[in-house]
Amino acid sequence: MGDLDLCRERTRWFPALVSNHVVDMINKYPREQLPEALTGYITDRTGYDYHHHAEVGSSNAAFVGDEVTDRFCVLGSVDDHRRKLAELAEAGVDQFNIYLMNGDEEEQLEIYGREIVPSFLRVSGTA
């Protein structure tokens, strides 16, 4: 949470990790049945080294650009997090997983508990 460029660098590993599942889907289903928004970002993927799986700064994520990172992740300021989570809720998402493996984990969890989750409790009446 915080500076957008730093957030992107700390979370770029996640869309890289997801790319393994996208490759599996492409191998199982006809590509034309899958949305380009999901499959298009892996065209520059050259491989994946599981020795650096889910690792911040891993070369596995070199093919993942800012646009893809922004689309796959919740990044930026507290207000940015609230805004993106509200957009996801409007789209029908009712669960959200916080990956506490990007640095400042305790601070992120504290901010979510203090500033983000309560704002959704006021809106929905539930967590």
Named regions from a protein language model:
Residues 1-90, 121-126:
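An alpha-helical appendage that flanks or caps ligand/catalytic pockets
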Residues 25-26, 42, 98, 111, ...:
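Weak global preference for isoleucine
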Residues 70, 96-98:
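Hydrophobic faces of well-ordered beta-strands that scaffold small-molecule active sites
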Residues 74, 101-107:
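Acidic-and-aromatic substrate-binding clefts and catalytic sites of carbohydrate-active enzymes
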Residues 105-126:
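C-terminal helical cap(s) of enzyme catalytic domains, especially alpha/beta-barrels
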